[in-house]
């Protein structure tokens, strides 16, 4: 009550007294804490103005609460809240001071780090290596042209590229296979075998003489076109002449692509007409432009056949001077020539069937008939040329029988027909089914050749009169 009554006389003095008492009594440890916080704030080099204002506000706070009386704890709570945040923010401010120093040092740290990285970037040599703008073909060409002998091995080419370009020196094992592939797949590079007296490993590689203008104006940066090697004409002619000198059984014919180890043109020309062989050779030359020329045919050309009229005239002229067996053979060959002309015109190519009933069966009638027909058989040699009489018919039948047999048994059939003549009825019945069989030209050509040879021998021995 005394405090409220004396408040009007001396407000300022009462306020100061109340403030001191309140601070000394009610807030015992907070004043000291505030001072300590002030000292700590001053130690952090913070401005002293805001803490002084806070203390003044704390000093001015209690008179307002004193007039209300019971609201002193609430009035005292305001400075405590004001000082409370001060207490709470004191440590962060101190920490902030330290954090500021750390921020300064930390800021200097990244700056120094960036400066260090900026200083190390131009010192790295690997980033400055750039791949040369040359292709592998250009690099190989450079290596070969700079060598004294104008040829290098694969290892020599790789060594030149590594010494000349640092980029390839750093990546040496990766591009060696690329060099090897370009050497083997491009026609502008030619492989040269190593000499026997030159020790070492690997073949030499050189440039094709025709690939000198492969690059534009001598610059290795640009290539005109892909080089393709063309085989020279004179080399092919020399190879053809050399292989043709081996004959029909040459190595080329044995290693050809024909069905039986022959070249297609040789296989076609060996067993066909000359025109067909020429056509086949032309087709093979078009299909295989680098193939060897066809070799000579394996079989010799056939002997030309004599006309049947001329052969019959010569046989009639020499018939009187020859023996019976030779006359029978000449007559048989004349009939063969005539039959050959007929068969060639008709174009029959069927084979001769076997004749099991060609030979007569052994019986008494055949023996009796042979004894009675012996004179007719002897006259059959001349009768076959004249073409009349029973004996002549029998002789003609024997000749036909001997002709229908293979050419190897012509002489044996002729002798059998001479020593064992047949009767007219028996011969006709036996030969009738044989004559109905169409003739084949399989054995006509050898028979004609034998006829021509026999005629030449007879003419040389007995000249025509």
Swiss-Prot record:
Interacts with POU5F1. Residues 21-39 have a biased composition (Acidic residues). The gene is Foxd3. This is Forkhead box protein D3. Binds to the consensus sequence 5'-A[AT]T[AG]TTTGTTT-3' and acts as a transcriptional repressor. Also acts as a transcriptional activator. Negatively regulates transcription of transcriptional repressor Rhit/Zfp13. Promotes development of neural crest cells from neural tube progenitors. Restricts neural progenitor cells to the neural crest lineage while suppressing interneuron differentiation. Required for maintenance of pluripotent cells in the pre-implantation and peri-implantation stages of embryogenesis. GO terms for cellular component: nucleus; transcription regulator complex. It is found in: Nucleus. Keywords: Activator, Developmental protein, DNA-binding, Nucleus, Repressor, Transcription, Transcription regulation. Residues 130-221 bind DNA. Residues 1-18 have a biased composition (Polar residues). Residues 105-118, 377-400 have a biased composition (Gly residues). One of its GO terms (biological process) is in utero embryonic development. InterPro entries: FH_FOXD3 (IPR047392), Fork_head_dom (IPR001766), FOX_domain-containing (IPR050211), TF_fork_head_CS_1 (IPR018122), TF_fork_head_CS_2 (IPR030456), WH-like_DNA-bd_sf (IPR036388), WH_DNA-bd_sf (IPR036390). One of its GO terms (molecular function) is transcription cis-regulatory region binding. Expressed in premigratory and migrating neural crest cells in the early embryo and in motorneuron and interneuron progenitors in the developing spinal cord. Residues 1-127, 375-405 are annotated as: Disordered. PROSITE patterns: FORK_HEAD_1, FORK_HEAD_2, FORK_HEAD_3. Pfam families: Forkhead.
